[in-house]
Amino acid sequence: MKKLLLMGFLISAAVYGEDFQVQTIGVAGKYYQSFYKSDKKIIPVPLINLNYNRFFLNGVKAGFTLYEEEDFKFSAIIDPLGGYFDGFTVKAKDMDKGYEKIEDRDSKFMYGLNLDFNLSENVFGNINYMFGEEGDKGEAYLTYVGYITDRLVILPSISAKYYSDDFVDYYVGVTKKEVLENEKIKKEYKGDNSFSLGASITAEYSITEQFIMSAFAGYEYFDDKISDSPLIDKDNQVYYGVGFRYSF
């Protein structure tokens, strides 16, 4: 098949050719101010793309290719850390004073379907829909690949995400128990269907043929069904970071 760039949550990319597959292993550090009333966070982001026949590992998501054509690939995937890389997970101990007795919002195992596709030589996209114990979510991405030099590539990207009412309620809903135990929470809150819109840019520089350095930054806006929760500090999240990966 023609070149197909497949990106994970941030910048885990693999390039497929007609007779070869490029495997990558690496890690990035992502820094962001959580939209919760909590501390800033730094989290590791795995930059992994490993493939064996129809099986693959992209970041922490494992999958199996169900159908593949020249410009698209349809897969079944699982995500053992659903909600984590989106910024939805939070520990009570990390919340601001007056909110630190809430229940932890943990990552959840999720499963679903994934579609990677090319729109042109320089534009590729991804659509996926995931189901889980605490609700479901859908994501859509479009990314442009700008080749600046033989070593430097710029990748601007836009995204739209949907969150079901159960997903929103688990992460930003507030129970009566939490109102009673946290002095700054004054009311219960029931989550509803919501969405977010995002934009990001990534720069990738090939130090050698195998070692690649990446720098990225992004912005995500959250609908008021999320931002109106008593647990939420603002309706947006800004993040940035750097990463390194090895290709073989």
Placement of each model-derived feature along the sequence:
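Sec-dependent N-terminal signal peptides
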Residues: 3-13
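Start-of-domain marker
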Residues: 22-62
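A conserved mid-domain beta-alpha-beta active-site/ligand-binding segment of alpha/beta enzyme cores
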Residues: 181-200, 204-209
